[in-house]
């Protein structure tokens, strides 16, 4: 029998065993087929490993799943390296995690272009799952994953730029990445953008953004408010009040408190009352101050 016929025979036998639920025998036949050049047989072994790992329609067996993934790795299946890395990171069958093996497997998958592996490496370095927290490596792998289309990593890269963590603070780059992740449908996109805009709006007042831009600050606060942050103008008002040495800051603080008070924020009403009582950014008006204090 020719080698091609033998390969087809082994692959067919593997499929029959798979259909009959004889997974161990299926792996044996698929491996023989893979050894003879049937690439799809190696993928079948990896898929069987996934079934065994998750218990999808079969008895859960992480040890056998690990064995299947190792076979997949031999044939260069990137998902096999990813799944191995995930298993080693959490620990097999209730055992302790193995950071060294996890890193090696995930790096192999990432080197083959797997974005999930790159994202997981970013998370692992970010949270110290591989030992110590390593922000530079976290940023490196989050960026790889983001460039490959991982939306969660896009948000994380944005936050790294926003905070200046292991990379120069750059609110323009931060905003670009966060908006990109949101536009591409990440479930946390709205919340991440809302928080970013809220914090950045104050930084454009204090200069922590790298420059002072009151118009940008107001625009960001308006968008954060539209996304559900009803307190944002109150906090922006406090930022202006804290920097009241600037002649135009008290009137701007007043406008911010007024905007927040219109949203029903009690603390903003009290702050607005103080502005009227002390004539801070507005002409003194004790009657209005008392009214606002009562409402707060």
Please describe what each predicted stretch is:
Residues 1-21:
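N-terminal leader/linker segments that initiate helical-solenoid repeat arrays
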Residues 5, 36-40, 45, 54-56, ...:
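Short helix-capping/linker turns of helical repeat alpha-solenoids
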Residues 33, 71-72, 108-109, 144-145, ...:
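Canonical positions in the second alpha-helix
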Residues 63-93, 100-108, 120-123, 127:
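A generic tandem-repeat structural signature
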Residues 133-139, 143, 148-163, 168, ...:
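Ankyrin-repeat and related helical/solenoid repeat scaffolds used for protein-protein interactions
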């Amino acid at each position: 029998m020719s080698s091609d016929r033998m390969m087809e025979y082994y692959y067919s036998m593997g499929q029959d065993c798979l259909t009959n639920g004889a997974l161990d025998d299926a792996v044996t036949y698929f491996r023989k087929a893979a050894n003879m050049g049937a690439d799809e047989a190696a993928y079948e072994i990896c898929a069987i490993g996934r079934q065994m790992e998750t218990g999808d329609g079969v008895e859960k067996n992480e040890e056998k799943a690990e064995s299947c993934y190792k076979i997949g790795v031999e044939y260069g299946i990137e998902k096999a390296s990813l799944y191995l890395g995930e298993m080693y990171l959490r620990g097999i069958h209730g055992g302790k995690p193995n950071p060294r093996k996890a890193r090696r497997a995930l790096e192999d998958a990432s080197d083959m272009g797997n974005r999930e592996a790159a994202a997981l490496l970013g998370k692992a370095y970010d949270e110290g799952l591989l030992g110590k927290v390593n922000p530079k490596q976290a940023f490196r792998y989050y960026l790889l994953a983001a460039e490959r289309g991982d939306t969660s990593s896009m948000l994380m890269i944005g936050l790294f730029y926003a905070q200046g963590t292991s990379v120069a603070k750059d609110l323009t780059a931060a905003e670009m990445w966060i908006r990109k992740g949101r536009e591409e449908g990440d479930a946390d996109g709205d919340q991440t953008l809302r928080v970013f805009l809220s914090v950045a709006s104050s930084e454009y007042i204090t200069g922590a953004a790298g420059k002072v831009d009151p118009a940008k600050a107001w625009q960001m606060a308006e968008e954060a408010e539209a996304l559900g942050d009803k307190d944002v103008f109150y906090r922006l008002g406090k930022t202006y009040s804290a920097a009241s040495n600037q002649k135009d800051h008290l009137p701007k603080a007043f406008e911010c408190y007024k905007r927040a008070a219109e949203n029903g924020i009690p603390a903003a009403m009290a702050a607005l009352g103080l502005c009227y009582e002390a004539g801070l950014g507005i002409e003194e008006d004790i009657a209005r101050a008392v009214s606002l204090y009562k409402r707060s």
